[in-house]
C-alpha cells in the first residue's frame, strides 16, 4: 500500500491509497461487511454507490465460516466476490463489546463463543494469522478498546497493554511474510497525555497507517473533537489516519476537518433497515405517515438507483409492509449518501473551499454547528 498526500486545506487532507487491488480516494468511507457481506447488497451494488474499500470483521469470520472454509476459496475477496481492497478489524472491539463473556489477560483474551458457548482464545498472534488467511489489504493490530468512562489509571493500564500487543502483532505479521499493510491503533481514552504516549510508541514500532481507537464509545462529542485535534498533528503526515467506528454524517465532516482520512460505521446500513434515511436537507424517517402519498423522490439531489426510480410513498409502502426490497432500496440510498458526502469533502479540499462546504452542510441539514465551526464561519463571514 502507498499513501499519496495530494492537497491540504487547514488540517484536512486530500489523498489517495494505492493497492494492488485498486485505488481509494481519501477522505474515504468504508461500508461495513461484518460477515462478508454489506447487509442486503451484492458487491456490484456496493461498488455502484461509489465505495472503493470495504471493512470485514475478523472475529465473526473466524467463528463462522472459519479459516478452513476461507482458504478453500482463496481468501475473503474470493469468498465474497469483492475484488477491491478490504480492511479487517482485529477482533479487539469484540473485547470491548462482549462484556461479561470475556476475560482479558496479558497473553490475549478468552471469550465464550456467542454461537455455541465454547471457550475460545484470541491473541495478537492469532489475529495476525486469521487476517493473513483473509487476505486483508489492511490488517489491524490486536488491541483493547478502552471503555468509557474509564479513570486515568485504568486507561493507562489498558493503553500500555495495547502497546505490548501492538509490538507482538508487528512481530507476527512480519514472521508471516505478509506484504499487505499493517495499521497501529492509538488508545488512551479521553486523556491527551496517554494518547501522546500511545502515538509516540506506535510510531517508534512503525506501521503503514495509524488508527484512532476508543472514540465514539459514549464520550461527549466535544471530547472526540478535542482528542482528534490534539492527536492528528502527531501522526506522521505521510501515513493515512483512520477514525474507527465513526459515524454520523456530521462526525465524518468534523473528522475530516481535523485531519482524518478514513472512516467506517454500520450507521448507514443499520439506519436504512430501520427507515432512517439521510438526505441533503437532513433526515427522512420514511415510516412516518406524512410520506404515505408523497410522490417526490427521496432526495432530489441524489443520483442513486433508489432516488432515480422510486417515490417516498413507495418506500413508505415497502417499509409498512416489511418488504425486503424496502430495506435494500434504503441501504442503496444511505450508502450512496455517505459516498456523495465524502466526494463533496474531497472536492472542497481540492478547491480550497472546505469551510464553505462545512457551512453549507450544517445549513442544509439544520444541525447545530460545533463551536469551532461557528467561530471560523463568523470570522470568514460565511
UniProtKB/Swiss-Prot annotation:
Subunit structure: Homodimer. Within each dimer, one monomer is responsible for RNA recognition and catalysis, while the other monomer binds to the replacement base PreQ1.
Catalytic activity: 7-aminomethyl-7-carbaguanine + guanosine(34) in tRNA = 7-aminomethyl-7-carbaguanosine(34) in tRNA + guanine
UniProt KW keywords: Glycosyltransferase, Metal-binding, Queuosine biosynthesis, Transferase, tRNA processing, Zinc
Location of the region described as RNA binding in the Swiss-Prot/TrEMBL record: 245-251, 269-273
Pathway of action: tRNA modification; tRNA-queuosine biosynthesis
Gene3D superfamilies assigned to the protein according to its UniProt record, in alphabetical order: Queuine tRNA-ribosyltransferase-like
Protein name, UniProt field: Queuine tRNA-ribosyltransferase
Enzyme type, top EC level: transferase
UniProt xrefs under InterPro entries: ArchSynthase1/Queuine_TRR (IPR050076), TGT (IPR004803), TGT-like_sf (IPR036511), tRNA_ribo_trans-like (IPR002616)
A cellular-component GO term for this protein: cytosol
Cofactor binding: number and manner: Binds 1 zinc ion per subunit.
Amino acid at each position: 500500500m502507498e499513501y499519496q498526500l495530494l492537497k491540504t486545506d487547514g488540517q484536512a487532507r486530500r489523498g489517495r491509497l494505492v493497492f494492488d487491488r485498486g485505488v481509494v480516494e481519501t477522505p474515504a468511507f468504508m461500508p461495513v461487511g461484518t460477515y462478508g457481506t454489506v447487509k442486503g447488497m451484492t458487491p456490484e451494488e456496493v461498488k455502484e454507490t461509489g465505495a472503493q474499500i470495504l471493512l470485514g470483521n475478523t472475529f465473526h469470520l473466524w467463528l463462522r465460516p472459519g479459516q478452513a472454509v476461507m482458504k478453500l476459496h482463496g481468501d475473503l475477496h474470493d469468498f465474497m466476490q469483492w475484488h477491491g481492497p478490504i480492511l479487517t478489524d482485529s477482533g479487539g472491539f469484540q473485547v470491548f463489546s462482549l462484556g461479561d463473556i470475556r476475560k482479558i489477560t496479558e497473553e490475549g483474551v478468552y471469550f465464550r463463543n456467542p454461537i455455541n458457548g465454547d471457550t475460545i482464545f484470541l491473541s495478537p498472534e492469532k489475529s495476525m494469522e486469521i487476517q493473513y488467511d483473509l487476505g486483508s489489504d489492511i490488517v489491524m493490530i490486536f488491541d483493547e478498546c478502552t471503555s468509557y468512562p474509564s479513570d486515568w489509571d485504568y486507561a493507562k493500564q489498558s493503553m500500555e497493554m495495547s502497546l505490548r500487543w501492538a509490538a507482538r502483532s508487528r512481530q507476527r505479521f512480519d514472521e508471516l511474510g505478509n506484504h499487505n499493510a499493517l495499521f497501529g491503533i492509538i488508545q488512551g481514552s479521553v486523556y491527551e497525555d496517554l494518547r501522546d504516549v500511545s502515538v509516540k510508541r506506535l510510531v517508534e514500532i512503525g506501521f503503514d497507517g495509524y488508527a484512532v481507537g476508543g472514540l465514539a464509545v459514549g464520550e461527549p462529542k466535544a471530547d472526540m473533537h478535542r482528542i482528534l485535534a490534539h492527536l492528528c498533528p502527531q501522526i506522521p503526515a505521510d501515513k493515512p489516519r483512520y477514525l474507527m467506528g465513526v459515524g454520523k454524517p456530521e462526525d465524518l465532516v468534523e473528522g475530516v476537518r481535523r485531519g482524518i482520512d478514513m472512516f467506517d460505521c454500520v450507521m448507514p446500513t443499520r439506519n436504512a433497515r430501520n427507515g432512517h434515511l439521510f438526505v441533503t436537507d437532513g433526515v427522512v424517517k420514511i415510516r412516518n405517515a406524512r410520506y404515505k402519498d408523497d410522490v417526490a423522490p427521496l432526495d432530489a439531489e441524489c443520483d442513486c438507483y433508489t432516488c432515480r426510480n422510486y417515490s417516498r410513498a413507495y418506500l413508505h409502502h415497502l417499509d409498512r409492509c416489511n418488504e425486503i426490497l424496502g430495506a435494500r432500496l434504503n441501504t442503496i440510498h444511505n450508502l450512496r449518501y455517505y459516498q456523495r458526502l465524502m466526494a463533496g469533502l474531497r472536492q472542497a479540499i481540492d478547491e480550497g473551499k472546505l469551510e464553505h462546504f462545512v457551512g453549507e452542510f450544517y445549513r442544509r441539514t439544520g444541525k447545530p454547528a460545533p463551536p469551532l465551526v461557528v467561530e471560523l464561519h463568523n470570522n470568514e463571514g460565511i
